[in-house]
């Protein structure tokens, strides 16, 4: 049985409210869960301490038993200091795209041609 620490959605339409639960990975998103370990209310301001509340002892116990947090829950756990989120590296993100390279080359060529005419 593969356990996940994940979010289950509650609340009304356009007013989401999430419980952070430990559940079998095969169970539905809002289906049966083993234990509730926290809540997340995205409608509260970001600086509100009650926006995310976690029961750290329970979470640490489940992590020790092998439960895997989902990406969003791992962000919450990292912010609370309960788990470490691995750093991601995307070296191509900072590299300019194909069209940007072409525009830069055209600009450099145009600037080079302008310097020759002035000299």
Swiss-Prot record:
The keyword Ribosomal protein applies. GO terms for molecular function: structural constituent of ribosome. SUPFAM superfamilies: Ribosomal protein S16. Transmembrane segments: none annotated. Pfam families: Ribosomal_S16. One of its GO terms (cellular component) is cytoplasm. Keywords: Ribonucleoprotein, Ribosomal protein. The keyword Ribosomal protein applies. GO terms for biological process: translation. Residues 92-113 have a biased composition (Basic and acidic residues). Residues 81-119 are annotated as: Disordered. It comes from the Bacteria. NCBIfam families: S16. Belongs to the bacterial ribosomal protein bS16 family. PANTHER family: 30S RIBOSOMAL PROTEIN S16 (PTHR12919), SMALL RIBOSOMAL SUBUNIT PROTEIN BS16M (PTHR12919:SF20). This is Small ribosomal subunit protein bS16. It comes from Methylobacterium sp. (strain 4-46). The gene is rpsP.
């Amino acid at each position: 049985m593969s356990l996940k620490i994940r979010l289950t959605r509650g609340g009304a339409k356009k007013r989401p409210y999430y419980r952070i639960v430990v559940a079998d990975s095969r169970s539905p998103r809002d289906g049966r869960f083993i234990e509730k370990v926290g809540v997340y209310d995205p409608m509260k301001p970001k600086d509100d301490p009650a926006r995310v509340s976690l029961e750290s002892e329970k979470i640490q116990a489940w992590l020790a038993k092998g439960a895997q947090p989902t990406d969003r829950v791992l962000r919450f756990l990292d912010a609370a200091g309960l788990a470490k989120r691995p750093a991601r590296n995307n070296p191509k993100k900072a590299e300019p795209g194909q069209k940007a390279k072409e525009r830069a080359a055209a600009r450099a060529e145009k600037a080079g041609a302008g310097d020759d005419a002035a000299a």
